[in-house]
Regions:
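Domain-level signal for soluble alpha/beta catalytic cores
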Residues: 1-173
């Protein structure tokens, strides 16, 4: 889906997004302190059930569970070398839910890295853009219909994610 197609869809109807994925995963037994994406890949049935329930309740857009699946967050768990495969598998899981229900779109989900930008931290703006580009390239390859940037604590980091998206693809953000 490109930005024009998304705008047409948005003009035709109110689009309903999915719900509190993290909260529901914790209610389903995900312990605190684990990598959520790794937990989901080890408990695919929990995520698939949650996402199909969202779609059956009328959700139009599922957020692929790629929320913190960027290099910096994955590094906290020693999983940064798994970025490509984890993002591919997580998007595939959401696409499976859409296929099983026969409707819906999958949004690649991006959030903050947890690192402060210079001068408050060591991370340079261009490095941050590159970190988002790395994940977005995989999300596009995996077949996301659009991208979402959420739960950001910094306008600069939000800007970096949007710039990265616009440099990589024509997907709606």
């Amino acid at each position: 889906m490109n930005k024009h197609e998304f705008r047409q869809l948005f003009d035709e109807k109110i689009l309903i997004l999915d719900g509190a994925t993290g909260t529901n995963l914790m209610n389903a037994g995900m312990p605190l302190g684990v990598c959520p994406e790794k937990y989901i890949l080890e408990h695919k049935e929990v995520m698939l059930e949650l996402q199909t329930s969202y779609l059956n309740a009328g959700t139009d857009i599922l957020y692929a569970p790629t929320f913190t699946c960027n290099r910096l967050k994955l590094r906290e768990y020693g999983l940064e070398n798994n970025l490509y495969q984890m993002n591919m598998d997580l998007v595939a899981l959401s696409k499976q839910a859409v296929a099983e229900c026969g409707h819906g779109y999958v949004a690649g989900d991006l959030t903050m890295t947890g690192e402060m930008l210079y001068p408050m931290g060591k991370l340079q703006f261009e490095e941050l853009v590159d970190i988002y580009k790395e994940q977005i390239k995989v999300l596009v390859e995996a077949g996301c219909d659009l991208l979402v940037v959420e739960t950001m604590m910094s306008l600069a980091e939000t800007r970096a994610a949007v710039i990265a998206a616009n440099e990589i693809c024509d997907l709606p953000v």
